[in-house]
Amino acid sequence: MEIAAGYLSPYFITDPARREAKLEGPCFLIVQGKLASARQMLRVLEQVANSGRSLLVVAEEVEGEALATLIVNKIRGSLSCCAVKAAGAKEERDAVIRDLVTVTGAKMVSDEEVASLALDDLGGADRAVVTVNRTQVLGAARLN
C-alpha cells in the first residue's frame, strides 16, 4: 500500500543516501485527529520500545511535544520511529486511514484514546519505507 504523504521531519531518515526512513516490522499508531501532547503517547512509546519493534505514527497532525518526543527518541536510538501526516481532503484522508487500518490490522483511535492503547492494538507490517512525499507499507498485517 502506498500513501501520498511523507515524513514530518528529516530527523526520521535512516538512509541518508536515499533520503528514506526505513522501518522493519513496524507497529502503527493511527490517530484520527491531532496528536500534540507527548503525555498521550508515553505508554505506547514504552510498549513499542520494550518490544524491540519500530513505530510509524499516522495522524491528521503530529506537532509540538508529540513530534519533538518522537524525534528525540529516534535521535537517541531509544526507538526507531517516523511520523506521517495523513494528507488530503477529509474524505480522501479518511479513506486512506481506513485502508491503512485494514492492511495493518491496527486500531484507529482519537487523540484521547491513544493513552489507553495496548501493543496488540497497533497491528503491523513487514516493512515501511517513508520518503519526503510518500509512504509505502509492505507485507501483510503482522500481529506481534
Predicted feature descriptions by range:
Residues M1-N144:
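Long, structured protein-protein interaction/assembly regions in large complexes
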